[in-house]
Amino acid sequence: MEPLNRTEVSEFFLKGFSGYPALEHLLFPLCSAMYLVTLLGNTAIMAVSVLDIHLHTPVYFFLGNLSTLDICYTPTFVPLMLVHLLSSRKTISFAVCAIQMCLSLSTGSTECLLLAITAYDRYLAICQPLRYHVLMSHRLCVLLMGAAWVLCLLKSVTEMVISMRLPFCGHHVVSHFTCKILAVLKLACGNTSVSEDFLLAGSILLLPVPLAFICLSYLLILATILRVPSAARCCKAFSTCLAHLAVVLLFYGTIIFMYLKPKSKEAHISDEVFTVLYAMVTTMLNPTIYSLRNKEVKEAARKVWGRSRASR
């Protein structure tokens, strides 16, 4: 056998959409607009939930955290992706690749848990209305979100360290437009079983388990709604649950496709398309589906905007 050509890695080449120049020219204005809408929408929701005292409730605390996650997640890859769409040199340093991998894993994992926590909050609000404020106290909200942030960060750092310490051989071309951990692992010439097993275990804990919890919560909510005598109230509550469930299905469905699908040695353009869908469309739609259609949020936004104009 020939010895493995191990080299010290200083940078990676992100293949991305290199083979599709027409697609690159189309994606740049589209992704730029989506990125701007994502930042503006989520920043507005986060600001309103903090500045308006009437929104200092558990549901808007979690919505504020969701907006914070979306604001933290998209800058981990979108600005560099936009630069690469216009550039012929699509490289990323080893250190930046590791940071990008860690932050994207951490924020994505935290959002998985946040969606489950939000489903539990919806269940308590609809199914246990008299005990809601006792069961879902502010202290519990902070503890749940703090635990989610810390645990997912530790998990992501561990996955990144295990993966990036592997030896890399031959070309350093990542068949993706970001440093996705599965794409980087394909370049490793060492034993990747430990990293893959750790990643699979984390995927199972953060995908099927929370998703099953969310589905159970919504089934209990639906059963409660069907017992509500008022048809108008029933329809309103049911439509709200459908909106939340739509985002959950979009978010979890794309992740499950990317991480739990059968392995393939060749990269497919569908990976990139689904990653854009998961990473950008969901973060852009979250403010609209979760908050901007809510009358309380609209009223709070008008009050905050009015106070800001009056103070000038």
From Swiss-Prot:
GO terms for biological process: detection of chemical stimulus involved in sensory perception of smell. The chain crosses the membrane at residues 26-46, 55-75, 100-120, 140-160, 198-217, 238-258, 272-292. Its main location: membrane. Residues 1-25, 76-99, 161-197, 259-271 are extracellular. One of its GO terms (molecular function) is G protein-coupled receptor activity. Residues 47-54, 121-139, 218-237, 293-312 are cytoplasmic. The keyword Transcription does not apply. Pfam families: 7tm_4 (PF13853). GO terms for cellular component: plasma membrane. Glycans are attached at residues 5, 191. Disulfide bonds join 97-189. It is a multi-pass membrane protein. Odorant receptor. Belongs to the G-protein coupled receptor 1 family. This is Olfactory receptor 13J1. It comes from Homo sapiens.
